[in-house]
Each structure stands twice: as structure tokens, then as C-alpha cells.
């Protein structure tokens, strides 16, 4: 387990260290993109085969990581999304947020050349080629860790897949959306998608060939 403390001013880093967890304590707040890039660089440096991103509010079950790894192996995928809408669990969205999610799933399914139902999921597994790409090319703007990262992966010819996961009730913190914020999310996310689609891809090492 790696905890990236993105310039936090609370006791997060101290509590994690006391529990015996590896900590990257960034001196400045770099935002989600910078913190994720630091985590990817750490994963490559210490030789991780996979890195898994999940939210800290208790909604994602770490026991589902094995499901994502199995999907990466069986589908030869570089990025695996843990989807809230792929037939496992009863999570659902409403209003403008749901409209935005449906729109992005429609567009990104075509960009990634696979059916995707949850493109804004914060539960993802990254394989070796994804780690190599994102260690130096990970978007820092709004929704870069979801929509932007998927566009970069697809444009760089990485294989993206998804698998259904169970979501749990939020264990802490406040929801980041309400009707007004959801409408704003629709506008901002559409702009973020347009920016992401305007970027070229990156060259990464080819995927290993399957055994005959």
C-alpha cells in the first residue's frame, strides 16, 4: 500500500507511517494529477507489476482488486476500470450527472474501442505499459484522472477494459455533488473531454505477444 499525501496539513502521513504503510509526503499540493504521477513513478521505481487506484471514502472494496487483476490477465488489458454500472450492485446516478456519465460512456466506448459504462470511476488498475505511460504523461486538469487518462491510454494504443464491482455506502466525508454541482459537472466535464480529445497519443512499448 502506498499513501500519497499531497501537501496535506492533517495527520494523514503520520497515521499511515504509524500503521507501517509506505508514504510519499509531497511538500506542495500538486493536485490529483501530480499526486497520481508521483505514485506511478514510485510504482515503477520499486518494480510493481500493477498499481491500483481507489477512493478513500470506503466505497471501493479492496477485495475487488483481485477481480481487476484477473480481468487484466484474461483480457490482456493495460487499464481495467472497476465499473459501478456493469451488472454488479445497485449503484445509480440521477439528473445531469447521469446524463454526463451516459454521454461520456458513449463517446469513450468508441475512443477506447470497447464497451464502457463507468468512465468516471475512481477504481482502476494499471498494468506495466500504463505505468510507463502515466509516470510521465498524466493529465493534471479537471477529470484528468478519469476521462483524460482514458483518452491518453486509447490514443497511445493501450488496451482498456472494465469489470463490474460492488460499491459500498460512503464511510466518511461529504458527497461532492448536488443538483447545482451536478449541472456544473456536466458543463465542466464536457469541456474536459474536448480538451482530452484534442491531444495526440504517446508511443509506449508494444504489448507482449501471447504464447502460441
Regions found by a protein language model. Give the residues of each.
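Short loop->beta transition adjacent to catalytic acidic/histidine clusters or analogous donor-positioning motifs
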Residues: 1-2, 11, 21
Amino acid at each position: 500500500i502506498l499513501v500519497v499525501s499531497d501537501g496535506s496539513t492533517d495527520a494523514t502521513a503520520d497515521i499511515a507511517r504509524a500503521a507501517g504503510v509506505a508514504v510519499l509526503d509531497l511538500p506542495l499540493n500538486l493536485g490529483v494529477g501530480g499526486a497520481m504521477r508521483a505514485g506511478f513513478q514510485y510504482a515503477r521505481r520499486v518494480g510493481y507489476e500493477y498499481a491500483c487506484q481507489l477512493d478513500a471514502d470506503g466505497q471501493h472494496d479492496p477485495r475487488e482488486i483481485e477481480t481487476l487483476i484477473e480481468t487484466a490477465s484474461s483480457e490482456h488489458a493495460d487499464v481495467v476500470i472497476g465499473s459501478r454500472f456493469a451488472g454488479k450492485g445497485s449503484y445509480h446516478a440521477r439528473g445531469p450527472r447521469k446524463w454526463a456519465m451516459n454521454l461520456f460512456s458513449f463517446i469513450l466506448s468508441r475512443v477506447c474501442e470497447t464497451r464502457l459504462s463507468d468512465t468516471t470511476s475512481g477504481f482502476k488498475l494499471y498494468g506495466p505499459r500504463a505505468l510507463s505511460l502515466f509516470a510521465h504523461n498524466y493529465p493534471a486538469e479537471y477529470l484528468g484522472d478519469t476521462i483524460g487518462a482514458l483518452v491518453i491510454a486509447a490514443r497511445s494504443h493501450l488496451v482498456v477494459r472494465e469489470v463490474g464491482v460492488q460499491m459500498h455506502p460512503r464511510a466518511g466525508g461529504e458527497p461532492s455533488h448536488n443538483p447545482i454541482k451536478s449541472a456544473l459537472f456536466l458543463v465542466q466535464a464536457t469541456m474536459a473531454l474536448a480538451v482530452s480529445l484534442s491531444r495526440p497519443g504517446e508511443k509506449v512499448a508494444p504489448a507482449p505477444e501471447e504464447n502460441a
